[in-house]
Design a protein with these regions (language model features):
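Gram-negative outer-membrane beta-barrel transporters
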Residues: 108-119, 137-231, 293-297
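Solvent-exposed loop segments that connect transmembrane elements
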Residues: 3-35, 68-87, 125-139, 175-188, ...
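C-terminal beta-signal and adjacent terminal beta-strands/loops
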Residues: 119, 158, 221-231, 250-298
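Outer-membrane beta-barrel strand-turn architecture
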Residues: 40, 48-52, 92, 102-106, ...
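Membrane-embedded beta-barrel scaffold of Gram-negative outer-membrane proteins
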Residues: 49-62, 67, 87-149, 154, ...
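Short sequence motifs at beta-strands and strand-loop junctions characteristic
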Residues: 32-40, 89-92, 141-147, 190-197, ...
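Residues on the lipid-exposed face of transmembrane beta-strands in outer-membrane beta-barrel proteins
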Residues: 36, 44-48, 98-102, 151-155, ...
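Surface-exposed extracellular loop regions of Gram-negative outer-membrane beta-barrel proteins
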Residues: 1-21, 25, 37-51, 55-65, ...
Length: 298
């Protein structure tokens, strides 16, 4: 019975027309009890195998998320400039991508990557603004653009047993137009979209006189700053960070044993940070962790 037109069993007065809003037009509405979406999306890809070791492709694709209902529908800002809609519409994305997959240097280097542009229309966003309602609600808050470059590689240098691997992404995001309250500001970054993220690892393996295989590995992970939301009262800056992991061990066909140290510098890297309900809530990565790992292959 938790339907839009009647609010909720515990607090029907939140949504019930004629009780909350005081707006005769809104109070007269017959609020829907379901959200529906329909339409057609497409995807097209062209690829070119320049050689057995090099392939290029271009992709055009579309996507969407279905609409949803809002519990506090009809509630407004004090000046009446914004009113929560009963239904949040679908948001849509159009993606343009050029990419490549390569095997180079006689198989010693594999490098894949892509350049992409994404057009976002009517981005669905969850909003908490006590000046409007003491409940979360959603709206199509903004139009936005995303431009990026990403890639990954594996490289085997002329040192037996050594492998170097990594991945990276570069992002440029921007809210082009605010479609909702003044809580969303054009020109700002999208949430959880650091300008740069990267990781690189080096692993060295060697044969032992016992017939086992020894290994040692180091990894460095880094991220640029980002923001936790596009809603100004709820957002927080998440600082850039970097941290390292190391591990060493012995293995054979039947088992693997290793010691590891994750987050050697005990970095408090923030992965979530917001001010919802006017209380800052921060989530960080695990602190420095030292452990032993043993795995048996059956």
């Amino acid at each position: 019975r938790d339907q839009q037109r009647f609010g909720t069993n515990s607090s029907a007065a939140f949504n019930k027309p004629g009780v909350v809003t005081g707006n005769p037009f809104i109070d007269e509405l017959n609020y829907p009890d379901k959200a529906e979406s329909d339409g057609v999306i497409g995807k097209a890809t062209l690829s070119w195998n320049k050689s057995d070791d090099v392939m290029y492709y271009v992709t055009w694709s579309e996507g969407f998320r279905p609409g949803l209902l809002n519990r506090p529908a009809g509630q407004s800002t004090p000046d009446g400039s914004y009113t929560v809609r009963p239904v949040t519409d679908s948001d849509e994305v159009t993606n343009y991508e050029f990419g490549w997959k390569t095997v180079l240097q006689d198989g010693r280097l594999r490098f894949n990557g892509s350049v992409f542009m994404v057009d976002v229309s009517g981005l669905q966003t969850t909003i908490f603004d006590p000046s409007i309602a003491n409940l979360f609600f959603s709206d199509n808050a903004a139009d936005a653009d995303i431009t990026g470059l990403e890639g990954d590689f594996i490289y085997y240098p002329n040192i037996e047993g050594l492998m170097i691997s990594g991945a990276f992404s570069l992002l440029d995001t921007e809210i082009k137009k605010s479609l909702t309250t003044s809580d969303v500001v054009a020109g700002r970054d999208l949430a959880f979209a650091p300008g740069m993220q990267a990781n690189v690892a080096a692993r060295y393996e060697w044969g032992m006189s016992s017939g086992n295989l020894g290994h040692i590995q180091g990894q460095l992970i880094a991220s640029d700053k980002s923001y936790s939301d596009i809603i100004e009262p709820n957002k927080a800056k998440q600082d850039s960070y970097s941290y390292a992991n190391v591990r060493a061990g012995i293995s054979n066909d039947g088992w693997v044993a290793e010691i590891y140290i994750d987050n050697i510098t005990d970095e408090r890297a923030e992965i979530s940070n917001n001010y919802v309900f006017d209380r800052q809530r921060v989530a960080v990565i695990r602190p420095m962790t030292i452990g032993l790992r043993y795995k048996v292959n059956f």
